[in-house]
Structures are given as structure tokens and as C-alpha cells.
Amino acid sequence: MRKRVITILALLLAVGATAQQTNGTYSFLRTTNSARVAALGGLPLPVYDNDIQLATFNPATIGEGMNNKMGLSYVDYYTDINFATLQYAHTFNSIGSYAATVQYHNYGHFDETSESGVVTGDFGCSDFSVNIGWGRQLTPNWNIGAAVKYAGIQYESYSAGALAVDVAGMYHSNSGWTFSLNARNIGTQLFNNINSSRDPLPFSIDFGASRKLEHLPVTVMLWYDDIQHWNKLMMTPTYIEQHTNPITGQLEEEGKVAQFIRNAACHLVIGGELTLGKNIVLRSAFDYGQRYAMDVPKERTLVGFSAGLAVKIKMFEISYARSRRSVVMSPNYLTITMDLNKF
């Protein structure tokens, strides 16, 4: 039974790695459940517009404008795998604004069998996290934020837990640019009876910039992710296909300059939002690193692309996104946010 659970655990971790190009027991902490964030590449958004969807990944976006707002998200990820999120924000005049987030990842149920293959029951596998974020506007140009989170894992009777913090800062320039710097998942594992190892958390430092164009209803965004980890190059099937000599069959190493450019490109994500009137927003992004890691040779795919839209109806905003994470994974994201002050 233990071997079977460990095998399933390895499969689930592979799903997490496919989704976010990171390994480890706690890779789900890098997975977004927000439709807006997913449509724009899955990274902390460098915008400050009181959208509670942004609070989980970027606590510097938490402010007084989020007071008494709520968000509900659902992700149809892959086969029986689905995620759900509940968010709420409140402002306390003396100590700042807070946002609470509960995320739940369900990986479905599996048959429990004896060594002879007889089904004796079933068991579930799931992850969850509880996040409390704080944010404050220091000046008209500066915002800061921090969050503490507990991450838990339950696979059959095996479990693990970790504690982490996020810190973030945001600067709004007088020229219209907004810059954001985030350090996520700084922490440690508390316990682990799955494999008795001390697994690291998926620490990352991400930089983002955005600007709303002056004469067009467009906001452009650019990210450089995983600043702490330069080398993202790997021997993907596409890379091998492109760099194998057709005559000798030998793999030819890419030049140093080409390696540098490709490596830098693997860190870049570009995206944008187009506002149509007062109630409709279109969103899209492209993640070259995701495409480089998960694309397949000689296939025309949309791996690395994501898109979505939002519709505002009175006190509600309904957001939908679809993200092409690999040739077999295109998760669907749905988020409903509401301003309880308007009820």
C-alpha cells in the first residue's frame, strides 16, 4: 500500500511540475486559481486596482479599496483534478488592510487494493493552503505587503505541512509605470511522513512592470520570473530535434550567445489587457519558458499562450481564462468577485 501511495505522489508531483516548471512536494504553492492571473501568465500582477484576485500572489496589491470584497474561484485543471479558492478582504483603520485566502486542490479518489489486487476501499489526495496577507500604501508612489501561509498535504494517511511568508513592494512612477518585486514562499517544512525527507519550498523572486497606455484602453505587462535561478535551459524534445545534425545524428551544442538569449527569454512573460467600454476586459499573455519546456517537435500548438475575459455586472465581476500549459493540459479558470459594500 505504501508503494502505491508513493507512486501516486510521484504522479501528482509530475502534474505540478508540468503546470509550473518546478519540482517538489509544495509545487502547488506556485499554482494560481485566479482567472485573471492565469490569463496573464500566472505570475504576481504589477497592477494596483483593488482586485482581490491579485492578493494571494502579490500582497502589495492589498489596500483600502479591497475592503469588504470577496472572491470565489474554480479551476477545472485536468481529468479529475480541480481547485477551489475563497478570498475575503477587510481594512482596519489602525493597522492596515488584510486579505484571507483559502485554497483547496483536489486530485480525485483512488482505489485501495490488497497485494493480490482486491479492492478494499478508496482514498483521496489533496493539498490546501491558508494565506493571510497584509498591505499598506506608504505614499502615493509606494505600496508594501506581506503574507504568511500554511500549506498542507494529505495523500491517503500520509501528510506534510509547511509554513511560509511572502513579501512584496510596488512602485508607481510619475511617468505611468508600475513596478513590482515579489519574494514568494520563504519558509520551511514543519513535518513530513510521506517520504521522511525535508522538502524545500518553491522559493521565487519575480519582477513585473505594467503601464496603461495614454491614448488606448490597453495595459501592457512584462515579467521576469525566478530571478534567483538563472539557468532554465534543458534538453527538451524540441531542443533535441532542432539541434541534432541530420547527417551525423549528433547533438550539436548551441553557441554561448544563443544560450544566453534563450535562457533570458525563458524568464520572460508578456501580457496585456484591453478594456472594451466600462464592463468588458480582454486578457492574454505568452510565456516562452513554458513553451520551451512543454512544447513538442513538429507540432503547431498554443503551448505557453493564455487568454481570458472579464464581464462586470453591477457589484459582480465574472472572469474566465484558459491556459495552454502543455499539449494535453488546458485548464479552465472561473472567478467571481463581488463588492459586498454594494449589497
Model-identified regions with their sequence ranges:
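Sec-dependent signal peptide recognition
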Residues: 2-10
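Generic N-terminal leader/processing signal
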Residues: 1-2, 281
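Subset of outer-membrane beta-barrel
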Residues: 20-343
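Generic start-of-chain signal for non-secretory N-termini
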Residues: 2, 19-20
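Hydrophobic h-region of N-terminal signal peptides that target proteins for export
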Residues: 10-18
